[in-house]
Amino acid sequence: MGSIRPFNVKRTAEEIAEKYPSLFTEKFEENKRKLEKMMPDVSKRTINIISGYLTRYVVKKKEKAEREIEENAAS
């Protein structure tokens, strides 16, 4: 069972993902490094939490897009 993320973490991660859609990938470490450069004054723990949620958000978004393509192809 996973942990529940605070609303501000979700909102921040989703805003960043929408603002820079091609910048973030499915790799946590890469996303973490990019966030550290974007937000240098944020604590390491917060960066890790946002990066983790952002990574999952990107993966879910990609899987959803793939599912929609498959459903449209089957129709």
From Swiss-Prot:
GO molecular function, one term: structural constituent of ribosome
One Pfam family named in its UniProt record: Ribosomal_S17e
PROSITE patterns, per the entry: RIBOSOMAL_S17E
InterPro entries attached to this UniProt entry: Ribosomal_eS17, Ribosomal_eS17_CS, Ribosomal_eS17_sf
Keywords from the named record: Ribonucleoprotein, Ribosomal protein
Assigned protein family: Belongs to the eukaryotic ribosomal protein eS17 family.
Protein name: Small ribosomal subunit protein eS17
Name of the coding gene: rps17e
